[in-house]
Structures are given as structure tokens and as C-alpha cells.
Amino acid sequence: MDAGAFLDASQRVPPPAPTTWLSGIFETILGAILLWVVARSIPQANSLLRGWVGMLALILLLHFGTFRIVALLWQSLGVKAEAIMSAPLRSTSLGEFWGKRWNLGFRQLSHELIFRPLHRRLGADATGFLVFAVSGLIHDLVISLPARGGYGLPTIYFVLQGTGMTIEHSRFGKRLGLGQGVRGWCFMMVFLAVPVFWLFHPWFVLGVILPFMRAIHAL
């Protein structure tokens, strides 16, 4: 997140709207129900499905719910604290999804440490592709290494994201309108969803997520 804005006492923000609170509370409760009720009801024979439901529930419970409520608490005190997720499915391009709406904390770090120092030397597209490659390696460290399998698949996933964003920014992509509207949204979802099993591969779901769910008595 933007620590400078967070610590700047001169930047005061208005209190969040009640509907924003309701959204954060709803997503927290829904995530908890999916994690401790729905996932448990899935037969043990469908372990991979169990793990996927539990993993999505954790993302909803934490990233979209609890972390959002924490940000709202700070905002109610006048502090400029942004939620790390900003309605990512409203994006109409990969660039908007990864750059403005998904996991803004990681986006801030990668922008400060990689993109800003290198984009003038390498160009925006090449530096953006490099950011995706580095993101893939980091996700391999936190996903594949603990799972002891699936090495390289998260990196390939993020390289594909960089490839998709390069296509969006190309003349061909602009001519087809891939960075906007319904067509842009569909193009984005193909790149995000079709290869997502390379990011959260079975080794991770079965070897990390399921044991974690048992540890928190979700199974």
C-alpha cells in the first residue's frame, strides 16, 4: 500500500459510505460460510474441489472482507487507507485488473521497486513484462516451494499475463478493442481464468490448502 499517503496527516478522507461497510461485512460472512460450511459438505472424494472452494473462501474472507473492513476503520478516522482489492471483476482489461484493482499492496511494491526505476530505460511494455516475470518467480516461491511440486507453473501463468497485456497494447489489440468494453473483459477473463490451474496448481491445493483447512477446523 501507499505508506506515504497513509502516514501523511495532512491528507484526510471523508468517512466511508454505509453501503461500503455492508459490502465488506457481506463478503466476510460469505467467505466464512463457504469455508466452514460449504467446503465441509463436499465429499472427501472430491478433495481438489474441496480445496478450491476453501481457497476461494479464504480470499473472499480475508482479501475482500476482513482487510477491507480494516481499511474502512482507518478511513473512518480520516486516514487514507485503500483496500487492497478494488472490485477487480469490473476491469475491462488485463492492465486495469493487475495495475489498478487486484492486490494493490503488491502492485505498489512492484511499481516502486521494478517499474519506476526501469521503465524509462526499457520502455513501459518491456518493464511491465519484467514485472510479471518477477511476480511469477515470487509466486513460485510462496506456492510451489511449500507444496513441493508444480515448479514453474505460477511463473508461466504470469508470463502469460504479460503476454496478454502486450497484445492489449499492440496495434492489433487496440484495433480489436481488447482493452475496453465487453470485448476487453472477455479477453481479460480468458487470460485470467483459463490457465488459473497453473497458478493454483493441484500440488498447492492438495498439499497446502487442505492441510491448512484441517488446521483451522474447516474440514
Q: Which ranges hold each PLM region?
A:
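Hydrophobic alpha-helical cores of multi-pass transmembrane domains in eukaryotic membrane proteins
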Residues: 29-34, 133-137, 159-163, 190
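Hydrophobic core segments of alpha-helical transmembrane domains in multi-pass membrane proteins
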Residues: 52-60, 132, 154-161
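Membrane-interfacial catalytic/cofactor-binding modules of polytopic membrane enzymes
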Residues: 71-144, 176-219
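Residue-level signature of transmembrane alpha-helical entry/exit and packing/kink sites
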Residues: 24, 28, 51-55, 124-128, ...
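Intramembrane catalytic core of multi-pass membrane enzymes that act on lipidic substrates
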Residues: 1-77, 83-85, 91-92
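Interfacial helix-loop-helix junctions of multi-pass membrane proteins
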Residues: 143-155
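Transmembrane alpha-helical segments that form the membrane-embedded catalytic/substrate-channel core
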Residues: 2, 60-77, 109, 162, ...
